[in-house]
Amino acid sequence: MSFLQPSRQKYRKTQRGTLKGKSFRGNQVAFGEYGIQALESHWITQRQIEASRIALVRSLRKGTKVWIRIFPDKPYTKKPAEVRGGGGKGDPEGYVAVVKPGRIMFEFSDVPQDMAEEAFRKVSAKLPIKVRLVKAGGMSI
């Protein structure tokens, strides 16, 4: 199973940062007919993105175009089990995409609305945040 991750990066570990504010970039449907939009802030892991992508592709018919609009480029670290505090920051465990409210995470096109709603229902179960289905032009469904 190949997960999304950066091919190269300048620093191995990053600071956690905050999840304040909303998304000012990537908040409109740009490529497809429908989009899945985040309503909350959260870190979305590379595993969650892949699980959502598989659920989306399997619930749509062949010939449907799918775009993934988020990329996990932030490394997150974790200390091993049963290790006391201190001793420095843990080793990188994986990568996450920082998602803020308003961000379009997935887009797809060439599909009827009822099939789009069913695909949305399956994808939303794979994500740790509240999401909504939006149509191109900014209309919520």
Curated annotation (Swiss-Prot):
Keywords: Ribonucleoprotein, Ribosomal protein, RNA-binding, rRNA-binding, tRNA-binding. One of its GO terms (cellular component) is cytosolic large ribosomal subunit. GO terms for molecular function: rRNA binding; structural constituent of ribosome; tRNA binding. One of its GO terms (biological process) is translation. InterPro entries: Ribosomal_uL16 (IPR047873), Ribosomal_uL16_bact-type (IPR000114), Ribosomal_uL16_dom (IPR016180), Ribosomal_uL16_sf (IPR036920). Part of the 50S ribosomal subunit. Binds 23S rRNA and is also seen to make contacts with the A and possibly P site tRNAs. NCBIfam families: rplP_bact. Belongs to the universal ribosomal protein uL16 family. This is Large ribosomal subunit protein uL16. It comes from Hydrogenobaculum sp. (strain Y04AAS1). The gene is rplP.
